């Protein structure tokens, strides 16, 4: 199978899994935009729109490859003008629920809402200032989640019910 076909299948699988979980059309594949790539997927979570980039790897990517994937995700998110970027890494022979999802901590804070994070963890003014800086710091650390954890973070329990 050609690499382009593998990518198309992966993007479609991510779209289908997210839409099934969310219970509505929260994710769609993005058409190519020439040299100004806008990512592979457009994902809507409440009032945020995220750019999704997908990568298929036969084995776990090296640190250098992973950094390149993250940089590409940031660039494509900027090109698309969206609220944050999300990197999906499919490793051969893993179920979709165990695919890795990488997002910047700033995207995580946008998804959770800065005020709800501060309230939940009872943070002081200094911690609030650090979190606010993370929202504008595009090179800040990334979080690694599983696909299942990402979907639960964004949409809670699946619309079709637990255990089905």
What are these regions (language model features)?
Residues 1-164:
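Catalytic phosphate/metal-binding cores of nucleic-acid and nucleotide-processing enzymes, i.e., regions
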């Amino acid at each position: 199978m050609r690499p382009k076909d593998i990518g198309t299948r992966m993007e479609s699988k991510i779209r289908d899994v997210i839409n099934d979980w969310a219970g509505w059309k929260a994710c769609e594949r993005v058409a190519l935009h020439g040299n100004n790539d806008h990512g592979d997927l457009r994902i809507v979570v409440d009032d945020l729109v995220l750019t999704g980039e997908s990568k298929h790897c036969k084995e776990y990517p090296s640190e250098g490859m992973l950094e390149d994937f993250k940089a590409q995700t940031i660039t494509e998110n900027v090109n698309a003008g969206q609220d944050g970027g999300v990197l999906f890494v499919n490793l051969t022979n893993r179920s979709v629920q165990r695919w890795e999802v990488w997002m910047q901590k700033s995207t995580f804070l946008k998804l959770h809402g800065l005020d709800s994070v501060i309230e939940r963890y009872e943070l002081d003014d200094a911690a609030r200032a650090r979190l606010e800086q993370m929202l504008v710091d595009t090179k800040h650390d990334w979080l690694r989640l599983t696909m299942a954890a990402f979907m639960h973070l964004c949409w809670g329990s699946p619309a079709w019910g637990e255990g089905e």
